[in-house]
């Protein structure tokens, strides 16, 4: 019961929450600087 209720309910919840937050944060954060860096560099170099 413990392995099927406590850890099971906590694992997927934590994984889902962490995955969603990490994916969203990483994607948004990486997308913002990634797109800004190359654009700024290109604009500056050109």
From Swiss-Prot:
Membrane-spanning parts: none
Gene Ontology MF term list: nutrient reservoir activity
Region annotated Disordered, chain positions: 1-46
Keyword entries, A-Z: Phosphoprotein, Storage protein
Biased composition (Low complexity): 13-32
Keyword Signal: no
Domain of life: Eukaryota
PTM characteristics: Phosvitin, an egg yolk storage protein, is one of the most highly phosphorylated (10%) proteins in nature.
Role, per record: Phosvitin is believed to be of importance in sequestering calcium, iron and other cations for the developing embryo.
Protein name: Phosvitin
The species this protein was found in: Anas platyrhynchos (Mallard)
């Amino acid at each position: 019961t413990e392995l099927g209720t406590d850890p099971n309910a906590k694992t997927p919840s934590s994984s889902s929450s962490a995955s969603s937050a990490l994916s969203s944060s990483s994607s948004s954060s990486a997308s913002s600087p990634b797109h800004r860096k190359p654009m700024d560099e290109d604009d500056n170099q050109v």
